[in-house]
Amino acid sequence: MASANIHDYIAPGRRAHLVGIGGVSMSPLAEVLHKAGMVITGSDMRNSATVEHLRALGIPVAIGHRGENVQGAELVIRTAAVHDENPEIAAARAAGIPVFERAQAWGAIMRGYKNALCIAGTHGKTTTTSMCTHIIMAARMDPTVMIGGTLPLLGSGYRVGHGDTIILESCEYCNSL
């Protein structure tokens, strides 16, 4: 079996397939990995404006989950909502392709930034992440941001910046960050 350390896979030229790529935290992940020079493919259950946006960036997105969608991938990334019975997860495992959780990927990405802010907790994560984003953007630091709600300043729940700062609203699920 291939290495089970996601840090071995987050590198330019590596091929990742994202299951549920149209999701609120998966689409910015796809953009960040694409911007970092990775070859990204993905799948989602339905077409959407988000899926069309990813396609416009040159990221192929299949509609529907089928085992053949993971062909050529070196790793597969999924959300916790995608179970082992999913045909793409089952096909990846059968082919020896490592499967990682979305939060593991964000954790690996964070390590590539000079400044990483990760907001966690029971209540107020979105508000606190929004406030941090406003402050960092006012300081003209051009951060990459992933937030759990739509921030009017961004017009969405994320932005792919060009600076050395990343701000993430994190989830403590599985202690994966």
Cite the ranges covered by each PLM segment.
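N-terminal leader/targeting and accessory segments in enzymes
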Residues: M1-A105
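Phosphate-binding loop of NTP-binding sites
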Residues: V32, R55, N69, A80, ...
